Every structure is written in C-alpha cells, then in structure tokens.
A protein has these predicted regions:
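N-terminal helix-rich module
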Residues: 2-8, 29-48, 52-55, 59, ...
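Internal alpha-helical transmembrane segments of multi-pass membrane proteins, especially GPCRs
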Residues: 9, 14-18, 39
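Alpha-helical hydrophobic helix detector
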Residues: 17-33
Length: 167
C-alpha cells in the first residue's frame, strides 16, 4: 500500500484556532461600536421627539394666537413635559399616551440640565421664552435651545453626536 502520495484535506487545529481568534477580536470590536451607535441613535431620537413636541405646542400657540406653556415635571428617574393653556392648567403627573404630554421613551436618556421648569410660547409674533434643555446618555449630551424669537435647534455639547453639530 502506498502512503506517501496522500494529499492533505481540511484545516489543522492551529489554523482553526487562529481564524477563530481573529473573528472573535473583530466581533468584539464591532459589538462595542454597535452599542455606542445604538446609544447615539436613542439620544438623537429622543431629542428630535422633544423638539417635535415643542414645535407642535409653538405652532398651536401661533395658530390660536394664545400663550401656551409647557411644564417640565421631573419624577425621580422619570420626567415628562406637559402642555397647557397656562401653568396652573398643566397636570402634575406623567401619563403614557396622552396627546398633551411628552414622556421619554427610553430609560437611558436622562434630563441633564434645564433653565426653567416652565417654557412659554407666545402666540403674538411666534415668540417664546428663551431657555434650553439638555438630554444625555453614554453617547454624549444634546442641548435643545429655544430663542426669544421662537427658533428651536439642537446641538451637541461636548462631542458631535451623529450629524448634530457642536454648540
């Protein structure tokens, strides 16, 4: 029987271990990047939803030519924003699925800083009370700025988060 003519088929154990090590290292780095990206997406979406809510309140104020207030209600870990005709009409509790309220959707986005508990939008000339609200998580910190003329915009405070520019 001839045994010297055999061709090798398959991979050696050492080759398999090297390939598995390389794949594990690349997957670990990719997983870390993916988690950071998800955190940035959650922060950006929460800030955009808050901006949309405040824009609706501002548009409603301008449409009816009335002053509207938005009250910020921090309740421990939870927080929400409640819209009303004035500060006394705003509810004191956060409820899910209420059209006049903005409730945060993710647990990891926290309210970092704010200038006042009450933000006012004036129907006359579409003006507003100036202020800002900062939201943060492990991906960074975003600031929603409200100017006296009623302009609202988002900016990143310390580092660029996705496509939102620095303040």
């Amino acid at each position: 029987m001839k045994t010297g003519n055999r061709q090798q088929r398959g991979f050696t154990l050492l080759e398999l271990l090297v390939v598995l090590t390389i794949v594990a290292l690349m997957a670990g780095g990719g997983l870390h990047g993916w988690i950071q990206y998800q955190q940035a997406i959650r922060l950006e979406q929460s800030a955009q939803q808050l901006l949309d809510f405040l824009s609706r309140v501002q548009a409603n104020s301008y449409w009816h030519n009335e002053t509207r207030t938005v009250k910020l209600i921090p309740q421990g870990e939870l927080w929400c924003m409640v819209a009303g005709q004035n500060e006394k009409q705003a509810e004191e509790t956060c409820r899910e699925n209420h059209p006049g309220q903005f409730v945060r959707r993710t647990q990891d986005v926290v309210l970092a800083k704010f200038t006042s508990n009450v933000f006012t939008f004036f129907g006359l000339r579409n003006a507003a009370q100036a202020g800002h609200i900062s939201l943060s998580n492990s991906a960074g910190q975003l600031r929603l700025i409200i100017s006296v003329r009623g302009r609202m915009r988002l900016c990143s405070e310390s580092k660029v988060v996705l496509a939102i520019p620095l303040c």
